[in-house]
């Protein structure tokens, strides 16, 4: 099964939205990586991983960049996200 990783921070309403979207889609098996306490280093890493995005949340499937909360919501609503996570 493909692995979903989501970079978040604790006080981010968009990150809370992602958690809700994933729960509504029945997706419970994902890794949440908090940037709290190491924001500068993690934001630099996000810039490198995404090709320029430094904001959170940002999502990856098997190290392939998927997008932000809007992208995840769109993929979850269409059912595509579940298909992307299937083995």
Question: Which residue ranges define each predicted feature?
Answer:
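Thioredoxin-like thiol-disulfide oxidoreductase module
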Residues: 35-54, 83-87
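Amphipathic alpha-helical interface surfaces
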Residues: 14, 18, 42-45, 68, ...
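Non-catalytic, surface beta->alpha helical segment in thiol-disulfide oxidoreductase systems
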Residues: 61-87
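Conserved short-loop catalytic and cofactor-binding motifs
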Residues: 30, 34, 47, 69
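Structural micro-motif
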Residues: 50-60, 69
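Short, low-complexity, polar/charged sequence segments that are solvent-exposed and flexible
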Residues: 24-27, 49-52, 78
